[in-house]
């Protein structure tokens, strides 16, 4: 089974964070590539654990996926933007 996802990578201090969207799985590494590898492994484990518990279909549907030709298709991203908000707090 093939499940696609999009990865965002950013730096926090000396670590790089990789976030798999829309699965909401994240991991980190000392380099961007190590962070990507770590999040790929985290996604594999997350999906395997979900399948073992019988919740994979529900999790994928809640994340916006749909089943097409035996593959789960995620949302099509129209854009990724960095936004900001002014607040009184």
Question: Where are the regions that the model predicts?
Answer:
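Short, flexible helix/strand-to-coil boundary loops that buttress conserved ligand/catalytic motifs
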Residues: 20, 29, 60
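Short aromatic-glycine-(Arg/Gly/Cys) micro-motifs in beta-strand/loop hairpins
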Residues: 3-22
């Amino acid at each position: 089974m093939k499940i696609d996802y999009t990865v965002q990578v950013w730096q926090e201090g000396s670590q790089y964070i990789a976030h798999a969207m829309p699965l909401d799985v994240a991991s980190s590494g000392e380099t961007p590539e190590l962070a990507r590898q770590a999040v790929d492994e985290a996604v594999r484990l997350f999906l395997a654990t979900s399948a073992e518990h019988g919740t994979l279909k529900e999790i994928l549907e809640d994340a916006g996926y749909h089943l097409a030709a035996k593959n789960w298709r995620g949302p099509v991203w129209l854009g990724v933007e960095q936004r900001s908000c002014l607040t009184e707090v």
